[in-house]
């Protein structure tokens, strides 16, 4: 019939135009950069989700595995030992001193560093060598969940990472609810003996202490891991002393405090120990450490004079 053919041709042209535009859009999307801001505000660009990742701290390696990105890791630093698969990764030095040549040789498309643990001068050198560097700095318990989500985005494993982040937040909320109304316990958290070191206010462990209804007696200090004196501890007079050492074994030096009989923590035998791996690594396992910390502070409360 007259007029039908032009309409059909017009329809076909529209279909072809739509198909061409769609193909162009998809092609552009496929080559679009992924843009992120790291914890220092630095812009990080990736052409596609990272496939060759180097973690410059044990907790970063552990969190990458938790985020489903373990198979995308090509290197890490000394003491990266969890999960067991992390022990098999090539080493690129220690987190405080990395081997730039070893990193470059592994041809990573992403290096994830720790602001307060790694040397930021070396991080800048990695950027100068043309490598993409993402700086991480979790300071609060909630940051662990956010970190999992971000690692999932960086590695293209959000399906796993988002589930782990949700589980973390659920456990965190349960701990918060269980400890919200408990009386405060003045707490000294001892990282090491010589030099005598603790955690300052910005440190994630201070957040864990608050979560458990504790009050970090050195929480007013702005450093992450300040050195302090025995006299400062005596003056602060904590009700509980929580120490870490190496692994599960209670450090022998914890009972060095017994000589200071005036300390409330000593008088009530509130000298506790937690494995540093589950307390001082910014990973999902920090909730295991926090659970133990909360239990220790409950013991301290139970030993108060009636």
Predicted feature locations:
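Bacterial N-terminal signal peptides that target proteins for export
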Residues: 10-19
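N-terminal signal peptide c-region/cleavage motif recognized by signal peptidases
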Residues: 27-31
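Extracytoplasmic substrate-binding proteins
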Residues: 33-36, 42-43, 109-110, 114, ...
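Short helix-initiation/N-cap motifs at beta->coil->alpha
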Residues: 39-41, 92-101, 117, 221-230
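A short, structured surface patch at a secondary-structure boundary
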Residues: 51-106, 110-116, 217
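Short secondary-structure boundary segments
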Residues: 57, 115-116, 191, 221, ...
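His/Asp/Glu-enriched short active-site or ligand-binding loop at hydrolase and phosphoryl-transfer sites
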Residues: 77, 202-225, 245, 272-273
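Short helices/loops that flank or line small-molecule/ion binding pockets
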Residues: 100-107, 129, 228-237
